[in-house]
Amino acid sequence: LTPLNLYGYSKQWFDLWAKETGALKTIVGLKYFNVFGPNEYHKGDMQSMVRKGFLQARDVDALNLFKSYKPGYEDGGQERDFLYVRDAVAMTLFFLEHKEIGGIFNVGSGKARNWNDLASAVFQSLNKKVNIKYIDMPESIRNQYQYHTCAEMGKIRSAGFVEAITSLEDGVSDYVKNYLIPDKHLE
């Protein structure tokens, strides 16, 4: 694992410290992948692409995605492990209910999906024709941009988490139809 920035290094250093000191027997560390869902309106630029894409698709009937600069990945074909917030909560609560378990666990879907899939799900949830515009990726992030992330879910499954994970399409549909369109916030 090679972190891409100081924030990533700080997380890795803590993980290594916890492992070296034996603390992992008594604590749980969770590595969240690309979580999206209700109540992220306060996150500004850090909101998920589901919310950002919803606003673009609703307001201008188009959704912007970065062009690809890596062979083997089409424009919008960069992959992420997208996870609906309900599943992230279920996995987190699993460890609260099983205090005997310790270690570092991934919280993801275990499936890499691309940005085109996410954009299509947003348009489908709005009953609109898919209209993706591919834009240049800023030079400042091109060399650091991750083209593939996917959570390895074997460890959390072996620990006993057996619940099904919501599909990208079902999660986007629920979020768009039940929260974003009616502008509903969880309290």
PLM feature segments, named:
Residues 88, 92, 107, 118, ...:
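Non-catalytic, hydrophobic alpha-helical segments
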Residues 5, 44-48, 80-86, 113, ...:
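Residue-level signal for the nucleotide or nucleotide-sugar donor/cofactor binding architecture
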Residues 1-36, 40-41, 45:
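Catalytic helix-loop patch of NAD(P)-dependent Rossmann-fold dehydrogenases
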Residues 53, 57-59, 91-141:
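Mid/C-terminal beta-alpha module of Rossmann-like enzyme folds, strongest
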Residues 35-39, 65-80, 105-113, 137-145, ...:
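Glycine-rich Rossmann NAD(P)(H)-binding loop
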Residues 12, 35-51, 74-77, 85-86, ...:
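Glycine/proline-rich active-site loop of Rossmann-fold NAD(P)-dependent oxidoreductases
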Residues 85, 139-163, 174:
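Conserved C-terminal active-site "lid" loop/helix of NAD(P)H-dependent oxidoreductases
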Residues 167-187:
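Amphipathic terminal alpha-helices
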